[in-house]
Amino acid sequence: MPNKGSLSETASEMLHEAGYVGRRDPKDLYVADPENEVEFFYLRPRDIATYVGSGALDVGITGRDLLLDARMPGAHEIEALGFGASTFRFAARPGRFSTLAELDGVRVATAYPGLVDSYLDEQGIAVDLVPLDGAVESAVQLGVADAVADVVSTGTTLRQAGLEIFGPKLLESEAVLISGADEPEGLATLLRRLRGVLVARRYVMVDYDLPAKLVDAAVALAPGIESPTVSPLRDPDWVAVRVMSPRRGVNQVMDSLYGLGARAILVTEITAARL
């Protein structure tokens, strides 16, 4: 587990929602969960792929960018977790470069030398990599590099340093679950639980009453995962409908259902799911 940084809190919340014991003190580096037969080690996010790839740990949560930067052949991504999204881009002074080919032979500063080296090698571009441990946006101003390659969320930090993004994205990154070469015992359960959390975060439950003659039209508006549950009401001309709907856009779905003739439309949270 990430011990700190942007991935740590959300990863811990996700494991808690999946039914696992988490640490109570942010300084704790080890937590045992005997009920689920799992041990959690809290490590630097950058080191997690190394531990998993070497076989010291069975699975881990880290960033896709950190996994690729580690270049550990024994570690691989098995599930994207839907948080910690970012892109990996090149940046330089405005107008200095416009294409990746122009980087050939220049100095590029980055905190992800493994990732950048692999990417540029695939493109047939040779650069003089300048490895730094963070805050790479200052490298151009200080004369250490001609360009930088770094994780970008909004681009504000790069713009404040007088840099502009150029070239294609190196990578779309997010938090991922990684595993080693062998599938450890309990991985299937962990995956099923985490996928249940992802479903619970992405969907809500919608309940509404509707004239029975309008069911087909309502299902076209909100089809659900497989098929809605339709139950009879005391009034034989009306039915109760329950359906899972994507959280994003649910208010538009409610508006459409109401316009169709549905009433008593309720939306409730899903706390856990198995599909």
Question: What positions do the PLM features span?
Answer:
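Short, structured active-site "lid" loops
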Residues: E37-L57
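Small-molecule-sensing regulatory modules
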Residues: M1-V38, T62-T87, G95-L275
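Signature of uroporphyrinogen-III synthase
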Residues: T50, T87-A91
